Amino acid sequence: EYKLYLVDGADKAAFDAADIPVAGSFEELCKEVDIMLDSSPAGIGSKNKEKYYEKYGVKAIFQGGEKNSVADVFFHGYANFEQGVNKNYLKLTSCNTTGLIRTVDCLDREIGIDRVAITIIRRVADPGDYHRGLTNALQMEKAPTHQAVDLMTIMPHVNATGILVHTPVTHGHIIT
């Protein structure tokens, strides 16, 4: 059995009407836990930290959409694991950066890497998220991509640059 806690602004009456038991509020949850895996939308995690985590002594791991400043360490489980030990707040790299660093870090440990050039061709939106409106076009972001900058933050000895191309699809990524 799992307990369900509601975030601020959730309609508790709707849960009650559907006979879904609610254990409490998000603040009440924060009083009960030692660590929070915060995957809320970008910007909400830092608000949760200020409003709840610091108040109740809750350690937190934030998803890639948050600003790096939310955490003690910008964290990747392979490339800088040791830096995250005994820290209160970690911010994870984005999904693309996570995969990229896994590859670069493994190659770096085996043969040494000084420079990387990255190309990411990715969907413009997640499945079910169609609000971006890109149709029959490719959109290229300015170099270097945040993935290249993030890689250099985690692995400062590697010089990285990269381009990112958004495609008008909702499935799939190509990282080279």
Briefly describe each language-model feature range:
Residues V104-T176:
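Active-site-lining helix/loop region of Rossmann-like oxidoreductase modules
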Residues E1-A125:
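N-terminal Rossmann-like NAD(P) cofactor-binding subdomain of oxidoreductases
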